[in-house]
Amino acid sequence: MMKLEMVCTGEEVLSGQIVDTNAAWFASTMMEHGIEIQRRVTVGDRLEDLIAVFQERSLHADVILVNGGLGPTSDDMSAEAMAKAKGESLVENREWRQHLEDWFTRNNREMPVSNLKQAMLPESAVMVDNPVGTACGFRVKLNRAWLFFTPGVPFELKHMVKEQFIPFIREEFGLDAKVALKKLLTIGHGESSLADKIEPLELPEGITIGYRSSMPHIEIKIFARGEKAIALLPRVTGHIKMVLGTAVVAEDKATLAEEIHAKLLNSGLTLSVAESCTGGMITSQLVDFPGSSSYLQHGLVTYSNESKVRVLGVNPATLDDHGAVSIPTVEEMAKGARAILDSDFALATSGIAGPDGGTEEKPVGTVAIALATRSGVYSQMIKLPRRSRDLVRSLSAAVAYDMLRRELLTEAVIVDYQSIGRFSK
């Protein structure tokens, strides 16, 4: 079996100043291709440390993906460290120098002299193209390992891994591509309760289950390795969905927002949103996807009572009698948001995200959510105690999305979640 490792570079990564999302993405992507990373090492911007890691890990791994350190500044040392680790000099790659000059010309910019550093590669390096940036990728054989150098910019890394790295390792190591994966997205259920339902199932040979918690979602990954297992994957997936019931909210989607976007895009249906405690989160998550303007008409953050009255038309008496966090108020918010542009649907949220502001009657984590349609309004008030402010908001957004999703599927809009309580109306 091929031994794959990863070396992440950069003082800001090592010190925790930035979260290494590149490493998480790479590991997840490799797993989806049936390839497991054996080890990951993080190294700061010190030449001697980089040299030592390259020399030591190349004795054990077959392939090492090195991320970062290919920029034009003095702390970008990956190419120099690789050359010294192999006892080579850096030489100018004329093809990449031309690429740099062309790139700056196309962007109507004068190329700084410092960028020429990005064309300097170890003598034995094989250039790896990067059509979306200025950092030149390359690979070098040291001891038993191929070291594959990639840019730290996430977009550039992802492009290089998909277009260059994966085809390289498949060809170099003759890896079997007979691997398939299904992902089930769940909300409102703990990982242990999901596992309690799935683990008793007898899975066919070649099929395994994995879990990934990324609140407010928990993702269930169903891996199939080999032709027989791949053929059985749809049946196994269907069985697991049946066992989990309403916990499953999407298939092969990273978030519920992505699922809603997929359902509304090109549907001809429209959506408006009025948010209080979620503070624009619902709207923002949808706007992340290209094409959302085809269905998303407006997103309003009506945080104060005055804005609820003046913008959404909430009756002041409703606020006086029931408070901002209540079923009557959130229903009027949803109706008002829908009426502004005659949308097909409108979502509204109003709650107490904390850490302060709760009462005995309405403690922190109390959130009212409503969905207005052309035929009526659905609403519920959920309980999210002992959660952080961020988690209260993200779970509330997820429940709102799920109400809309279920309405689009003509299913019961309000359902029970194992880990989310609900007030009776």
Curated annotation (Swiss-Prot):
Similarity comment: Belongs to the CinA family.
SUPFAM superfamilies in the cross-refs: CinA-like, Molybdenum cofactor biosynthesis proteins
N-terminal signal peptide: none
Annotated Gene3D superfamilies: CinA-like, MoaB/Mog-like domain
Pfam families xrefs: CinA (PF02464), MoCF_biosynth (PF00994)
Biological source species: Shewanella sp. (strain MR-4)
Lineage: Bacteria, Pseudomonadati, Pseudomonadota, Gammaproteobacteria, Alteromonadales
Superkingdom of the organism of origin: Bacteria
The protein, known as: CinA-like protein
